[in-house]
Every structure is written in C-alpha cells, then in structure tokens.
C-alpha cells in the first residue's frame, strides 16, 4: 500500500513552488504567498504588506494599478504601508446596514474611516456635510449611511 505515496504519481510536479521559474517568482513575489482577500461592505479588499506597490497588487489581481489608486481615494504617488486596507473594487456610497453612526477615536482620519467601512471618501464628507478641510476630532459623530 505504498502505492499511494506522492512520489509514485509524481505529484510533486504540481506543487505550486515547482511550477514557477525563479525569474517569474522574482518579478511576481506574490505567487509564493498570495494576499488573503477579505470582504467589507460586500467589497473585496486585501491588507498591504511591507514593500507592496499598487503595480504589484494590480498584477496579482489583474486590475490596473490606476484603478486601485482611484478605488482607495489615494494619490498615484502614495506609498503603500503595511496594514493599509486596499479595495479591489469601487467602494460604496454608504456603509452596510448595521453601521449607521461612527464615533471618532484618537488617531482617526476621514480616509481611515472610509477605508474601514468601505465608503467612498467623497460620500463620507457629503453625508456629514463636511468639506475637505474638516479634520475629525475625538467624540465627533459621523454618519456612515
């Protein structure tokens, strides 16, 4: 019953590591450890890792890097930081049902809140009748829908 050993069927050939050339792995490091995809407000997102770029994420998910910049309300020269939430599709106009009001905590920004709840930044400002100059302060109550 050693008939079922992996080697007997040459299954090792199908291991992911063996499939890619070293050159391809250097150009596409995510092939070895793809990003985990999460969902918020019915939209897929990933959490950036140290050294990630919009171009790398775009390649991994077959999305133009310009779209990723736009979906996430960022500037094209923004440098991704470990822990950044990066949406793979356009965010929504408002948060999902249970989330109606958010109370601002220390360190919050409008962009951070918009990323956390998957809401377009301009809609978060509009819903709360705030302009681009507004900086949230601890205790402020912001509508999410």
Protein language model annotation of sequence segments:
Residues 1-4:
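Short, small-residue-biased leader/transition segments that mark boundaries at the very start
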């Amino acid at each position: 019953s050693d008939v079922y050993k992996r080697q007997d069927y040459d299954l090792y050939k199908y291991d992911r590591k063996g499939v890619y050339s070293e050159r391809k792995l250097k150009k596409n490091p995510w092939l070895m450890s793809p990003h985990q995809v999460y969902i918020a407000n019915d939209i897929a997102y990933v959490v950036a890792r140290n050294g990630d770029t919009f171009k790398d994420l775009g390649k991994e998910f077959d999305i133009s890097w310009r779209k990723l910049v736009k979906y996430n309300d960022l500037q094209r020269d923004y440098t991704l930081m470990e822990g950044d939430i990066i949406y793979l599709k356009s965010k929504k106009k408002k948060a999902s049902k249970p989330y109606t009001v958010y109370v601002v905590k220390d360190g919050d920004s409008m962009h951070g809140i918009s990323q956390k709840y998957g809401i377009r930044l301009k809609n978060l400002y509009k819903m709360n009748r705030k302009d681009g100059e507004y900086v949230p302060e601890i205790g402020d109550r912001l509508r999410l829908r």
